[in-house]
Amino acid sequence: MIKINQIKLPVTHSDEALKKKIIKMLKLNAKTGFTYRILKKSLDARKKPELFYTYSVAVEIEDTKNSEEAIVKRAASSSVLIYKEKEYMIPACGHIPLDRRPVIAGAGPAGLFCAYTLAEAGFRPIVIERGSRVEKRTDDVQKFWESGILNPKSNVQFGEGGAGTFSDGKLNTSVKDPSGRNRLVLETFVRFGADPSILYDNKPHIGTDVLSEVIVNMREFLVDKGATFIFDTCVNNLDIVSQKLLSVYTDSDNNSQIKTDVCVLALGHSARDTFDMLYNKGFDMECKSFAVGFRVEHPQRMIDESQYGIQKKIILPPSPYKVTSNFPNGRGVYSFCMCPGGYVVNSSSTENHTVVNGMSYHDRNSKNANSAIIVSVSPKDFGADDALAGVRYQEKLETENYKRGNGLIPQQLFGDFCDDRLTTAYGDFGSCTKGNTVFAKLNGLMNADMEQSFKLGMEHFGHLIHGFDRKDAILSGMETRTSSPLRIKRDESFESNISGVYPCGEGAGYAGGITSAAIDGIKVAEAIIKKYRPDFK
């Protein structure tokens, strides 16, 4: 195949215009037959309000008289080159017989893709998820948003699909993976029901509503491949002798002990009771830096006009944004989990704690844009340096946040936040939320240095996106679960200091988001496959 980069066309272009551009760049005869596939599509707004789509495409020539090499040479362009697609290959099995099925604790993206890879290699994993299957979980979450009644086991954080199920389903990642794992993740999502556009969109997203359906299809496939799913069940203990795993224990009344030589800890970033258990069991762990802040809402129309340079009269998706700033005090302030056309959601998972997140459906059709504007925190902010210090810091913020809103999402306009004043009414636009809200002061939740950094960050972002620091921008408190506050150490073989236990994904400190967690799950599965061969009785 031939790859063409940097095909630039107006956003209103037709399919025929793209074909003509391919013919022109390859200097083909108009009668030459060819097929093409989009590899990458991104919006170029650098000359706004003139907007363009930029494409990379793979072209297959049907005319065998002209070799691809000859066509590339004739094109005489650095944007035209020979293309060979990287196909992901599961590694060959190792030599050590594994006669007890591997256990995966957690059915988020890391756990699911670890299970998917293991199942494809014949390992028939047992997946144990503390939360409910996604069908029941969706009902539990909706009930919580409507009534405030929290199910500590089945909520926005816990349950099949992981915390990312109730976000935007964003799939972009900064992970560079030449082995084809990133492509495998996207193709697998499409295989189980996601829109094929995620394969080439520069900012791919599935949407909460579609992602739930994809997860069900993926689970059913894995069951057909020999995997077992155990829901509403938490791994609460490990049997370890001489630094070697012998079995896992769960809080189930039936068959609470599962003998195994391999356990993948695909924990979410909110599995605090499991972190405690692992710490007390002697796992090598360390606290790490993360970030906290507030979910900030603006009118989506304002963001579109700023990013696109026009009032959105032509068909364009709701615009995302990404903003970042660093200050002399060493703090970074940046946007996180930006949700175009989204909702602020109550994503609490513990009684008497309040935490928020952002969410979008596939069509991203709410009137507001939101993102977390967060401030970096490091172990020095925790006042301690043990592995669980960051967890305790999160809990402190979340319990105080709960008190501010009396269990509801506390909100304050940015202007009132700057003036340390209670908000009494929204400004020119209202909030789009899932979960009940109340006006409350958010001042003092972060320390003075962090709060000042947040204000300066908002002001700086106002120079980048007109209106970002408007006084009626809506702040919702607090966003504390941006990433895991700790890391469970592992060696080059992906094992912890306990033989047979493999820390994996976001909760273990090795990923940040759906795609990177899924890739890490695949990597851990590969390590297991390379070491063992299935030999189940």
Enumerate the language-model features and the residues they cover.
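Residues forming the flavin
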Residues: 3-53, 58-166, 170-537
